[in-house]
Amino acid sequence: MAKLNQQYQNLILQIKQDADKFADQQMQTVYKNQKDNLDEIHKYIGMLYIKNAVDGLLKVTPYQKNNILSDLNSKLKDMAKDMGNTEINQVTDILKKNYSDTYYKNAYVMDSGINVNLKFDILKKEYIDAAVNNPLDGQIFSNRIWQNKATVVDKVKQGIVDA
């Protein structure tokens, strides 16, 4: 097997690094959304404590507890839905852009480094969509995101109930 010229190895590595950097930059929107929702939970818990603390302990009747848990469950589900939609939209955009960019950049590097005339067709939208929605480990990424959000809601709710 022929050894790949170091110059082309570096170009291909740079394509990957550029894609990673783009993804990291674009995910900042998702991270901010997650932070905003975390702050909202902290405020909710703080207000709950301020309204119901007696001698430094949270004191609620069983009726109040049921209302609090119902309200908490509703808030957490709304937050998870918001975070899931934000993440899916952002990740979809990142995957589509990176798939397209890396295809064309790699095609250029390969075409410039090989003495054979290669033909790289224009990448059709349906090919990009198929690649983005291709299952990984039996699941498409959006299903994995929704499952992760459901798990987070369950763990946060349980953590608050246990506290």
Q: Across the structure, where does each feature detected by a protein language model lie?
A:
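N-terminal leader/targeting and assembly helices and adjacent pre-domain segments
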Residues: M1-V161
